[in-house]
């Protein structure tokens, strides 16, 4: 898919030679990068808040997720338009063309992830209205795992490094394991609680979709960094994911075992708290 898209991209670029000044392209690229970082930050925060809305039974977090919808929609439109304009230019570097295409793919995935976060928050609000319920204990764990992958994707976009994206791709399919365990629980729920349990079903589906969007983002980062022949981690339908809850993983030389989930999340939190992380060149 990416090879075909990249070939089409190059055809557009060559056929539009001289359409815009090359000096404009770097300004467009810088603007596109800033907008993409803004959308990454806002979308990740929405996903984080939606998961906390369920975990903490917090109506405030539910409202905070909805409040960012307008901003995300504006950023999605702006990124799409800027990337389109870039693809009509004669870009001097092939890497610039890859970035423009990857920005569109990342932007679309972030937009979809945000939409799922809004749905998760809405279903969490419904659970609060019903006074809560004895829910599936694995849902909080699933939320932490998905949130972790989302954060790794955002770090990959900010740092423009491939290692975090490859870590996410190494987890591809983990959401199916959570879904399988959830459906076993859901099928045995007392019929009197089924209506309320349906909200947790919707939350589980939303988290699964966000996980799939993280794979799209990670694939796009790999394509951006390495090109159309990068051979990013393929998904084989018949392959069983290696992880049940949280995989052992190595990020920048630090190995995290399944028992080290909280330490791993704390490390990512520290990265987000570092003032230099949010600086843009």
Label each residue range with its predicted role.
Residues 12-281:
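Cytosolic, long alpha-helical scaffolding segments
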Residues 4-7, 14:
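Short hydrophobic alpha-helical segments enriched in small aliphatic residues
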